[in-house]
Swiss-Prot record:
Keyword vocabulary terms for this entry: ATP-binding, Ligase, Metal-binding, Nucleotide-binding, Zinc
Ranges spanned by the short sequence motif 'HIGH' region, renumbered to the chain: 50-60
Gene: mshC
UniProt protein name: L-cysteine:1D-myo-inositol 2-amino-2-deoxy-alpha-D-glucopyranoside ligase
Function: Catalyzes the ATP-dependent condensation of GlcN-Ins and L-cysteine to form L-Cys-GlcN-Ins.
Catalytic activity: 1D-myo-inositol 2-amino-2-deoxy-alpha-D-glucopyranoside + L-cysteine + ATP = 1D-myo-inositol 2-(L-cysteinylamino)-2-deoxy-alpha-D-glucopyranoside + AMP + diphosphate + H(+)
Subunit and partners: Monomer.
Length: 414
């Protein structure tokens, strides 16, 4: 599947701003601690993508922006990055929306994926190296289920195939939840704990046998379509192998999605862990509730753009909140970010400004500490204020260098 065009990223050492390669520290849900990432020459990251029936709301945008920062910090540190993102282009919510609106599910998915690409391009999100739809990955998914079956980790309930969580001794490590905590979340987030015939209420669907009126694909275990969690297991290990550096997504994916996909991969390969770190973004709310498709309380990037918002102001509005925080979008976020963007743009157009080396060092330091983007923005604010006031030492190279820092590390074009 085609992703979207990559924005050019300035090379800061070439711009005269070399700096120590600070190790990126991220909060790992599995351990509950902020730990250094220690990638090899090529950092490997998998981020769960959209189910394309309502793209792109600000909750989506905040998540992909957070992992865009991860990508940029690693690249600034001299790493190559192999970034994989999926698209769940066949799943119950998509099929239900298509039926409700009288659309062909493929046309709905194609339209929403195209809109998502446009939004990611406008927000200057670095594209994944592998952008993989569930439909195109069905051969990989079938192979994964066959591997699980060869290890005795598949059973049937009325033609549907399930994964027994008892097959993975590490089940529960990703989320750290108890069974009592898992059960209601499993029911709320696409699971079927009440289904009769399952060995454990938490066992996850691997393959849904063909139903009338639903799309299906041939497989060694009969026509049907894949479950949600095994999709990401198959795609991630095919492109990244096991023990890749970061698996990411919204905090509502920690359980069951990341928990289940890790167990599938670990049992299928006999290796642990699926990912070295599980990194999750907070929820963006509106009117006191999480912004979500099911609730319908969505603010869309495309609507903000259509109403005249500068995409860089939208990006700054999101960067002003720490990626792990739960926060509420209000009518003040965008005007505040627009004013900040205008100040920064005015400052970098000056013939000289305070030296940029300290700005680069501070922004790098803040981002290395669990992506503290809000503090990084304050660093640039201080420089812009001093530059506009004509205060302190003046360096004619500084405005262009600060523009490069803001572009390379924060992804904001000034």
């Amino acid at each position: 599947m085609r992703s979207w065009p990559a924005p050019e990223v300035p090379n800061l050492p070439e711009a005269g701003l070399p700096g120590p390669a600070l190790p990126l520290h991220l909060h790992d849900t599995a351990t509950g601690t902020v730990r250094p990432t220690r990638p090899g020459p090529t950092a490997r990251m998998y981020v769960c993508g959209i189910t394309p029936y309502d793209a792109t709301h600000l909750g989506h945008a905040a998540t992909y922006l957070a992992f865009d920062l991860v990508n940029r910090v690693w690249r600034d540190g001299g790493h190559k990055v192999c970034y994989v993102q999926n698209v769940t282009d066949v799943d119950d919510p998509l099929l239900e929306r298509a039926e409700q609106t009288g659309q062909d599910w493929r046309e709905l998915a194609d339209r929403e994926i195209a809109l998502f690409r446009d939004d990611m391009t406008a927000l200057r999100i670095l594209p994944p190296d592998h952008y993989v739809g569930a439909v195109e990955a069905i051969p990989l998914i079938v192979e994964m289920i066959e591997r699980l079956r060869s290890r005795g980790a598949v059973y049937e309930v009325n033609g549907d195939l399930y994964f027994p969580i008892s097959a993975d001794p590490d089940f529960g490590r990703v989320s750290g939840l108890t069974t009592e905590q898992m059960l209601p979340l499993f029911a709320e987030r696409g699971g079927d704990p009440q289904r009769r015939g399952k060995k454990d209420p938490l066992d996850a669907l691997l393959w849904r046998a063909q139903r009338p009126g639903e799309p299906s694909w041939e497989s060694p275990f009969g026509p049907g379509r894949p479950g949600w969690h095994v999709e990401c297991s198959a795609i991630s290990i095919h492109h990244l192998g096991m023990a890749f550096d970061v698996e990411g997504g919204g905090s509502d994916l920690a359980f069951p999605h990341h928990e289940m996909s890790a167990s599938h991969a670990q049992v299928a390969t006999g290796r642990h862990p699926h990912a070295k770190a599980y990194v999750h973004t907070g929820m963006v709310g509106l009117d006191g509730q999480k912004m979500s498709k099911s609730l319908g309380n969505l603010v869309f990037v495309s609507r903000l753009r259509a109403d005249g918002a500068d995409p860089m102001a939208v990006r700054l509005a999101l960067l002003a909140h720490h990626y792990r925080s739960d926060w509420e979008w209000t009518g003040e976020d965008l005007p505040r970010a627009t004013a900040r963007l205008e100040r920064w743009r005015a400052a970098v157009q000056l013939p000289a400004g305070p030296p940029a080396a300290a700005v680069a060092a501070e922004v790098r330091r803040h981002l290395s500490q669990d992506l503290d983007a809000p503090s990084a923005l304050v660093t640039v604010d201080r420089w812009a204020e001093q530059a506009l006031a004509g205060a302190g030492e003046r360096d004619p190279a500084a405005p262009a260098q600060v523009r490069a820092v803001v572009d390379a590390l924060l992804g904001v074009a000034l």
